[in-house]
Amino acid sequence: MYWRRAALVGTRLIPVRSSSAGRLEGPAGISGSGMGNSTSSSLGNAATAPVNQIQETISNNCVVIFSKTSCSYCTMAKNLFHDMNVNYKVVELDMLEYGSQFQDALHKMTGERTVPRIFVNGTFIGGATDTHRLHKEGKLLPLVHQCHLKNSKREEL
């Protein structure tokens, strides 16, 4: 499977393969509250490659925000999806034992190390500023709806 950063934001194709190895779960995993949003605070162990766990999380969720708890841009992005009444998965990198390895993997996947790193419908759309721009242009919600439509069709089969 190939994921690409949205053409709306513009950049290169990023090859990524889905893998069944490693899940974004761990003994200290917690669930967020409100609107079904969830947070991962622990992501397994170092033996499981961060890239595989990132890929699986992105594949299993329509909206994923890789964040840090102290990041104001991350809060801005989470608030945007909350205000849009869109469920999302949050992975707080600073709460993970191997958070720096996950951030390194995200850097290799997206070309940028900063947070937030936001994926919608398996597509990297950028950071908070990119996401807000897509929303103002009326392009963000259609991306989210595409994912929900795809998931609905998958459930019908």
Curated annotation (Swiss-Prot):
The keyword Iron applies. Keywords: 2Fe-2S, Disulfide bond, Electron transport, Glutathionylation, Iron, Iron-sulfur, Metal-binding, Mitochondrion, Phosphoprotein, Redox-active center, Transit peptide, Transport. PROSITE patterns: GLUTAREDOXIN_2 (PS51354). The keyword Electron transport applies. One of its GO terms (molecular function) is 2 iron, 2 sulfur cluster binding. It is found in: Mitochondrion. [2Fe-2S] cluster binds at residues 62, 147. GO terms for cellular component: mitochondrion. Disulfide bonds join 71-74. Pfam families: Glutaredoxin. Residues 51-151 form the Glutaredoxin domain. Monomer; active form. Homodimer; inactive form. The homodimer is probably linked by 1 2Fe-2S cluster. This is Glutaredoxin-2, mitochondrial.
